[in-house]
UniProtKB/Swiss-Prot annotation:
Gene3D superfamilies: 1.25.40.420, Potassium Channel Kv1.1, Chain A, SRCR-like domain. Its main location: secreted. This is Galectin-3-binding protein A. It comes from Danio rerio (Zebrafish). Disulfide bonds join C58-C122, C71-C132, C102-C112. Residues 272-374 form the BACK domain. Glycans are attached at N137, N197, N200, N204, N412, N432, N543. GO terms for cellular component: extracellular region; membrane. The keyword Endoplasmic reticulum does not apply. Keywords: Cell adhesion, Disulfide bond, Extracellular matrix, Glycoprotein, Secreted, Signal. SMART domains: BACK, SR.
Length: 567
């Protein structure tokens, strides 16, 4: 009788709205899932699912280790080879991942190291692909996965909220004081996290959490059930700290990546400085790098903020070693360091002062400011006069002698003659107009668009090249018609172009130009993106291509920076 009922049910007609196993739109999609597009089932362009949308992977740093992770995630034994340069066609939508660094042992691609979702300087012409190994013993038996796990997270969240059947107490207290918060949870959930050392005999757990973060403990414990959590600029610090306390490494990494997208929301710099210190304590290198990059880009604003005097020695040491640090010139950076030393007083030992001073690139200080340094009355100068004089001597040599003369005296691994991103008027031009209007209205008296600027720089910072000029033109295109007018192929908009005229190539044997585009919010004065030019062109990221919450959509300015260096 039971078999008859089941057999009869198979023939019950269904409505036109039924879901079938082969309905691609109705299949549940999971965060971090990957697929291959544009080729065979075992080869194609790699696409990854994030934030409700499929996107591609840039081929920068794309190697066999990354391909192995993708292929194993898809159920193949491994990878045969990688494909780059959009070999399987160009994708659409966001470019989610760039500069991937996989060990090869990760279970899914999103577990690999990367700077952040959507953080890239790529176009879809650089979409990565793979060729997977189908296995020598593969059979023709087809298996179709039935996945009903989509609602599991919500169900477990309801279980936490209801406390039904809870059998374990978490007591939260402020640094040894009496418990101020208790949560009743389920031991079996906590036992899934071996870092907590919960056994069948454990009945409770007491944790010390500062009062400022106690309100976030419940959200953290709920994450242990659901693997879902909302992160904001105000909660990121506490959630990161709590993830460290509870040993949830994956959440720490995820919060660090999310925080990268939220950094621009804090114009005071207090939150990123604090997050860097957390990154130091926990050994989170990705978080440290993301914070340092943002602070380097915004160094001009950071050194004039009250937070500058609170920066730790470790952060200062790391900042001064970076070449992506944006500042008017090297002399301004030295003055900021001297002011920081003055504010710190006796907290910074003479050895540490000397270490920081060694990161100043005296060779690149403008020669007139180099001359003035010898008359400095700063505490740093008084305590390290010999180091200053050595730096001044090397700086004057660099400005007076041809590079061929001093090349053998400079360590190839040294960064002392490599430029940072100097934004002084002699090395950069600023374009503030982002309006698209009448083709006649938006042009100046010379018939040139306000988004096209021509200017001159010296061929090199050395005084030897002071009177040898290179002419540059900076352009910002907001429409396809503008691109077409200047013979530029624009796959997306906006696009920036920056190129030197013919006299640039007169120095090609001794000088190279690694120019940069800086995007700055008009009203907030914070840099949120820095990009290299590839073949004189930079595709300016938008919300969809960055995958980040742009702090000033369609309301930012462009600074084009010339960066000459000896070859």
């Amino acid at each position: 009788m039971i078999m008859y009922i089941i057999w009869a049910l198979l023939f019950i007609p269904v409505s036109a709205q039924q879901w079938t196993l082969f309905d691609e739109q109705a299949k549940p999609k999971r965060e971090g899932r990957v697929r291959l597009v544009g080729g065979l089932p075992s080869s194609g362009r790699v696409e990854v699912y994030h934030d409700g949308q499929w996107g591609t992977v840039c081929d920068d740093g794309w190697d066999l280790a990354e391909a192995q992770v993708v292929c194993r995630q898809l159920g193949f034994p491994g990878a045969v080879s990688v494909a780059s340069g959009g070999q399987y066609g160009e994708g659409s939508g966001p470019i989610w991942l760039d500069d991937m660094n996989c060990k090869g042992s990760e279970s899914i691609l999103s577990e690999c190291c990367f700077k952040g979702w959507g953080v890239n300087d790529c176009t879809h012409q650089e979409d990565a692909g793979v060729v997977c190994d189908t296995g020598t013993n593969a059979t023709n038996i087809r298996q179709i996965s039935v996945d009903n796990s989509l609602g599991l997270s919500d169900d477990l969240g309801l279980l936490f909220d209801s406390e039904d059947g809870c059998d374990f107490i978490i007591a939260v207290q402020d640094l040894g004081e009496e418990a101020e918060l208790t949560l009743c949870v389920h031991r079996v959930i906590l036992m899934m996290y071996p870092e907590l050392n919960i056994t069948n005999d454990t009945r409770n757990l007491t944790v010390d959490v500062s009062q400022t973060c106690q309100s976030h403990v419940s959200a953290l414990i709920r994450y242990l059930y659901t693997r879902q959590i909302d992160v904001s600029a105000t909660s990121a610090q506490c959630l990161y700290q709590l993830a460290f306390i509870f040993g949830v490494q994956r959440l720490m990494e995820d919060v660090g990546r999310v925080f990268t997208a939220l950094i621009p929301e804090d114009n005071t710099f207090q939150t990123p400085v604090s997050m860097y210190e957390y990154g130091l304590r926990t050994g989170d290198l990705v978080l440290q790098e993301n914070v340092l990059q943002y602070l380097s880009w915004n160094c001009e604003f950071l050194i004039s903020s009250p937070v500058w005097s609170t920066v730790s020695f470790e952060m200062m040491d790391a900042l001064l070693q970076r070449s992506d640090l944006i500042v008017k010139d090297e002399a301004v950076l030295l003055e900021a360091l001297e002011r920081w030393i003055q504010d710190k007083g006796d907290q910074i030992s003479s050895d540490k002062q000397a270490s920081l001073l060694s990161h100043i690139r005296f060779l690149l200080i403008p020669v007139d400011k180099l001359y003035d340094i010898q008359f400095s009355s700063s505490a740093l100068y008084q305590n390290n006069e010999k180091l200053y004089l050595t730096g001044l001597l090397r700086g004057f040599e660099f400005n007076a002698l041809p590079f061929s003369k001093i090349r053998n005296q400079i360590d190839n691994a040294s960064s002392e003659y490599l430029p940072r991103i100097y934004t002084g008027d002699e090395w950069s031009v600023f374009i503030n107009d982002t309006t698209v209007s009448s083709p006649y209205y938006n042009y100046n008296y010379y018939g040139q668009s306000n988004r096209i600027q021509t200017f001159f720089t010296s061929a090199h910072p050395s005084a030897l090249y002071k009177d040898q000029k290179v002419q540059w033109q900076a352009q910002v295109f907001l429409t396809l018609q503008e691109c077409s007018n200047y013979g530029v192929s624009c796959n997306t908009l906006p696009v920036a172009r920056f190129y030197g005229y013919s006299n640039q190539y007169s120095y090609s044997n001794i000088i190279s130009y690694n120019n940069r585009l800086i995007l700055t919010c008009k009203n907030q004065n914070n840099v949120f993106h820095v990009q290299e030019f590839k073949n004189d062109v930079a595709v300016i990221p938008t919300n969809s291509s960055m995958g980040l919450p742009n702090p000033c959509p369609d309301d930012y300015s462009f600074r084009f920076v010339v960066r000459p260096q000896y070859i």
